[in-house]
């Protein structure tokens, strides 16, 4: 018997800086319910799904900065999303800004979680490949201060059993790094999912702007194919606080084929029928890691 499921992506349109978490959760609940009505077993939501993409601003007030982070998950405002997921029997992946205090020291991470059908958190990932810069740069029309507001993740690239599937996570820039995909592929991930907030304009290299969508889809398709895994990417998209964010949220098959793609720059749900056993086609006949890999020649990747 093949293992079948319906996988969904819940793309978010812009979130205004003034928009409250309560308002955002209502939007997420609508997409969760819509996905479940289409028979989805699991839905992927974007990076930093509860707020606007705040690293585009330079904050000097720590209290204002802290207001964008979650200190518990789920907190009272977010809990209805978990309760509705349990009621509908649909799992989800979702990103948020995490603030923890350890030894009296604040630690901030760009975090993603996996939630199963009963509404329980079964996996956590903290973004490792942080893009952007740490100090204010006046020439930019908007900042990209992830290196200032987050520290690199400390959980590696784990793979979790979520209901019937083995799942791993990326967050935004991670999808561009083949090392992230390969670690999860070696750990047997059948679905690799995550969210992104990707500006269509990159101030340091504006000559690449016309390639933004191409590079996004190239990363997703190559990562899926080279690791024999399904993948799903959920974007926060459209004109958000004078910054245009890339659309093209997608679901990709282990063959590298795009099987679902958003067409709008607003809240949108896409779904695809997923056969998890198709991962074996690639892993047994093309990318058979045990049979063909030669790790003794790859040492330089980890040394430099």
Swiss-Prot record:
<comment type="function">
    <text>Catalyzes the hydrolysis of N-carbamoyl-D-amino acids to the corresponding D-amino acids. Hydrolyzes aromatic and aliphatic N-carbamoyl-D-amino acids in vitro. Effectively hydrolyzes N-carbamoyl-D-p-hydroxyphenylglycine and N-carbamoyl-DL-p-hydroxyphenylglycine, and to a lesser extent N-carbamoyl-D-methionine. No activity for N-carbamoyl-L-amino acids, N-carbamoyl-beta-alanine or (RS)-alpha-ethyl-N-carbamoylphenylglycine in vitro.</text>
</comment>
<dbReference type="InterPro" id="IPR003010">
    <property type="entry name" value="C-N_Hydrolase"/>
</dbReference>
<feature type="active site">
    <location>
        <position position="47"/>
    </location>
</feature>
<dbReference type="InterPro" id="IPR050345">
    <property type="entry name" value="Aliph_Amidase/BUP"/>
</dbReference>
<dbReference type="GO" id="GO:0047417">
    <property type="term" value="F:N-carbamoyl-D-amino acid hydrolase activity"/>
</dbReference>
<dbReference type="InterPro" id="IPR036526">
    <property type="entry name" value="C-N_Hydrolase_sf"/>
</dbReference>
<feature type="domain" description="CN hydrolase">
    <location>
        <begin position="5"/>
        <end position="276"/>
    </location>
</feature>
<dbReference type="Pfam" id="PF00795">
    <property type="entry name" value="CN_hydrolase"/>
</dbReference>
<keyword id="KW-0378">Hydrolase</keyword>
<dbReference type="GO" id="GO:0051289">
    <property type="term" value="P:protein homotetramerization"/>
</dbReference>
<protein>
    <recommendedName>
        <fullName>N-carbamoyl-D-amino acid hydrolase</fullName>
        <ecNumber>3.5.1.77</ecNumber>
    </recommendedName>
</protein>
<feature type="active site">
    <location>
        <position position="127"/>
    </location>
</feature>
<feature type="active site">
    <location>
        <position position="172"/>
    </location>
</feature>
<comment type="subunit">
    <text>Homotetramer.</text>
</comment>
